Structure formats: C-alpha cells, structure tokens
C-alpha cells in the first residue's frame, strides 16, 4: 500500500491504449480492479466532463449487468461527438513529438546535474592538491572540459520543463477524449447490432445471459475489443472471456501470488 501501484497500472493502460494495444487486467480481489477502473473513468477534459475511456469491467452477473448499463450510457454520451480522423492522427503525432522533446529536455537536465556535481568535486580536489602542480594542472583541464559541456547544454529552467508538461498533458487529454469517443462510436456499426440488442434488452436476467454467451465466442470477443480494448475482471471470472486462446497484447495481473 502507498507505493503508487494503482497509478502505475493506470499509466500502463493509458499508454497501451495510445499505442493501440489490447489489455486484460485481472486480480484475485475486486478492490484493485474497481480502483483502477474508477481512476480511468474519472479523467476530466476541459468542460466536457470525463473522458469516455473504453475500459469495461466484467466479472460476475452483477458486474456484467453494470457493464451493459455502462455501455449504453457511454454510447449516449459519445454518439453525437464529431470525430475527425486526420485531426486525431495529427494530435497523436504532436503528442509523440512533444514527448520526445520533453524526454530530451529531461536528459539534458540530468546531464547538467551530473556535470555540476563533477565540477564541484574537481574544485574541491584542486583546493586540496594545490601543492601538487601536475595534479592541479590535470584537474584544471578536466574542469575546463566540464564547464565547456555545461555551456553547451545551457541553463534549463523549471518553467521550461513545466510548460512542456502542461502542454503535453492537455494535448494528450484531447487525444484521449476524441479517440475514446471514436472507439465507443463503433457500437453504431452494423456488425455490432447484435451487441446493441443485448445492451438494450429490457429483461436484465436475459441480457446478462445473452452477453455471457456472446463474449465467449472468439469472433464476438474480437469485435468487442475494437470497442473496448481494455477489459478488467477478476481472475476467477476471466475464463468467461472467449474460448481458450490468445486475445490480448498485454495481461496485467495484480496480486499474482493469489491467482490460481
């Protein structure tokens, strides 16, 4: 507890989504699953409310019923959002470039810290070895080299780094918002009509049973993953998803030592 495990899992899932990967998140207990799902469903974007992040929480029949209600609500929230694929691609490219720029800035910052530490160490050695001419001259040359590199790197202000972080976060949230909506809008596609019929079925017991049958079939699972690439469930209920086989690019297992 308190080690930031939930944030690490959330960041891993968001990165996987950005890279168009599918993820299965499983745990022995409900608590860590609910914690991660709640965080991913609570990312705000400007005045548009929460980002409709395409994660679905499955499990026992009660969880499945809630998932079907969530699918219906997400569809209502996103069906009228205008999506421009070319803009999304540009935003993704911009995000990638800004991340690279921020990475390079942080590398420069780390290198500068290391050089400043070396400069300080050399100055102390020169002060200690003033009576050793050869040693002092050698350290003087080293000091010049260090200071030359520091000059090449230049000053790096907190404001410069913070500006990149803030701009990068805003751009990323924009990308997440519209890309998430794009995924959810795939529910409109004719191939997903059978899923929408299950979602809109008025009989709760019947639609849970229908969905459990639906998600066991490989073809249906692959269609479902185009809408919800990130699926969370308990390790006990994971067997309900698809037939035996490989369906996910990544599997995150929390509390793995308790898994059976």
Q: Where do the PLM segments sit?
A:
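P-loop NTPase Walker
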Residues: 1-114, 121-124
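Short, glycine-/Ser/Thr-/acidic-enriched flexible segments
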Residues: 2, 30, 63, 220, ...
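Amphipathic coiled-coil/heptad-repeat helices and related helical stalk/stem segments
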Residues: 5, 9, 216-217, 260
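Short helix/loop capping segments that flank catalytic or ligand/cofactor-binding pockets
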Residues: 34, 240-243, 260
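Short amphipathic alpha-helical surface micro-motifs
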Residues: 38, 212-215, 258
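Conserved helicase NTPase catalytic core signature
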Residues: 124-249
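SF2 helicase catalytic motif II
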Residues: 246-260
């Amino acid at each position: 507890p308190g080690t930031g495990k939930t944030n690490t899992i959330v960041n891993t899932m968001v990165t996987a989504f950005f890279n168009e990967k599918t993820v299965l998140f499983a745990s022995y207990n409900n608590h860590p699953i609910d914690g991660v799902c709640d965080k991913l469903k609570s990312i705000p974007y400007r005045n548009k409310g929460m980002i409709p992040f395409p994660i679905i929480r499955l499990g026992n029949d009660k969880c499945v019923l809630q998932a079907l209600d969530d699918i219906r609500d997400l569809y209502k929230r996103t069906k009228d959002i205008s999506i421009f694929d070319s803009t999304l691609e540009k935003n993704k490219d911009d995000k990638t470039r800004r991340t690279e720029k921020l990475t390079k800035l942080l590398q420069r910052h780390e290198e500068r810290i290391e050089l400043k530490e070396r400069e300080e160490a050399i100055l102390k050695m020169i002060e200690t070895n003033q009576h050793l001419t050869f040693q002092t001259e050698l350290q003087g040359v080293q000091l010049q080299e260090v200071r030359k590199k520091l000059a090449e790197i230049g000053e790096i202000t907190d404001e410069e780094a913070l500006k990149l972080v803030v701009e990068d976060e805003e751009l990323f949230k924009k990308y997440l918002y519209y890309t998430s909506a794009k995924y959810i809008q795939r529910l409109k596609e004719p191939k997903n009509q059978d899923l929408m019929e299950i979602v809109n079925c008025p009989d709760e017991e019947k639609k849970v049973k229908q969905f459990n049958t639906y998600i066991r079939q490989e073809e249906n699972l692959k269609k479902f993953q185009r809408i919800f690439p990130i699926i969370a469930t308990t390790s006990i209920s994971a067997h309900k998803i698809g037939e035996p086989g490989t369906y996910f690019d990544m599997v995150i297992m929390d509390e793995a030592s308790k898994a059976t």
